Amino acid sequence: MSDRALKFPADVVHAAQASEHDSGCPAAVSLAQWAVESAYGAASMGDAHNPFGMKAAPGQRSVTVWTKEFYGGAMHSVQAAFRSFPSIADAFIAHGRYLMNPNGWPEYIKAQDCWRKNRDWVGFIDAMAPRYATDPNYATMLRGIVGDWHLFDFNLPAGDA
């Protein structure tokens, strides 16, 4: 088994590709976010199946856990309510829909344009990251993971998403 297959198990790759087929969100980006947010699956909130650290809105199924947030120029430990999903595949679908439904956020609209018009995963990451994460190095981390592991190989062919 290759190092990449060990780092990115088949069920996770399939979930990312199913999400891309459902929402259009590039599988490579979802996989890189999964790697960063869950430490390659080591921290997915157990039975909550939430590897992306997606926060819960009022009324959504959730678990409350300690997390780190970057604000005011420093990292802080805080408790927050995170969404709970029936499966990892459901989490990937929700994640893709979240990124591809811009809710009026110009960062997500720009990210979608980069991907849909030019298949530019770097532009997608650079546009999306400041809205998605509080860590100022988030885009750099994602770009590094996609490039180092050749995750762009997992993106669906244009027209299949």
Region locations from a protein language model:
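Catalytic cores of secreted/periplasmic lytic hydrolases that degrade extracellular macromolecules
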Residues: 1-161
